[in-house]
């Protein structure tokens, strides 16, 4: 018999110490990685339930195992809330990750060797949008588009030219490091011109889309995917959506997830997704997302005022790229210097980056996590000044120590879990 008072601390102190250290790090460090966020205690509670014990291969009402009557309710709640949140007529909540959701779309709509047109990783796309190191570039004929190097915006003329030239079966819109507003309608216009599917990966902006402050791709795309963390602030996982009312495609998508790419769904994670979708339907979520954008804009503006280059000259969403080429600082060194002061970012390539992806010449900076813990525009601006103080001379250890003390004080004022 399993006793309810069994715990990690007593049984595995080494593991427990690592967990406690990570908890402390999250509280005492300022998180600026654009793809990270903090889930609510309700999401954590759902993810820690006995639902993790239940195998449920298949879909609600069509399971391969018995005893699924209760987890069917859980999954149906997640599906209905996802549809309501994004205005979809189809939702699959089973993908374990955004990349697995994307892989399912490829499997459902394409044959091996088909041509796809996606955003270059070097210009802000994602590995699964056709990178040569990903399944999307290895199993398919991937053609890549980029941004206008002058404006930092998507070059729609190039997208159309490449589409007409290569006749892709699927065009991928979406990004992992792009600070502008994407014209989903323009992408659909190009896709229709060449008879291609339009697949949108909105993983980074799903929360903004749900709140109605970033254009929704749902009226334009054949299929949409997203992660359920990032701006959506739910558990780590994936989601597939559509609003085209095409049952044939819906069946293909379901089959591509199970049995095509996965076995049993993670029912405890699906429960956590259901909680997160309900939270995203609350009015407070819209207020949060509005502040996310305000904070990101304030940070980008402050960097520019301090003499730093921001790709595209600012941001219209939750993230931006800091170009350090003119400062002769590598992204790797900048990442480390800020990390020493308890400010967590990630090094990132910038357009025309002369350095390798392991070194880079830029930083990707995002505001979802700091906003989640309560930072407003004032705190965001102050934080940016501290970051500039460090980047002005990354060898100045006195500045680093001073900023670290200020960061710790600010984190104490705005705990993640108060």
Curated annotation (Swiss-Prot):
Family indicated by similarity: Belongs to the SHMT family.
Organism: Shewanella halifaxensis (strain HAW-EB4)
GO biological process, one term: glycine biosynthetic process from serine
Any Pfam family hit: SHMT
Cofactor: pyridoxal 5'-phosphate
Its biological purpose: Catalyzes the reversible interconversion of serine and glycine with tetrahydrofolate (THF) serving as the one-carbon carrier. This reaction serves as the major source of one-carbon groups required for the biosynthesis of purines, thymidylate, methionine, and other important biomolecules. Also exhibits THF-independent aldolase activity toward beta-hydroxyamino acids, producing glycine and aldehydes, via a retro-aldol mechanism.
Protein name: Serine hydroxymethyltransferase
TM segment ranges: none
Record-level GO cellular component terms: cytosol
Family annotation (PROSITE patterns): SHMT
Matches recorded under InterPro entries: PyrdxlP-dep_Trfase (IPR015424), PyrdxlP-dep_Trfase_major (IPR015421), PyrdxlP-dep_Trfase_small (IPR015422), Ser_HO-MeTrfase (IPR001085), Ser_HO-MeTrfase-like (IPR049943), Ser_HO-MeTrfase_PLP_BS (IPR019798), SHMT-like_dom (IPR039429)
Cellular compartments annotated: Cytoplasm
Recorded superkingdom: Bacteria
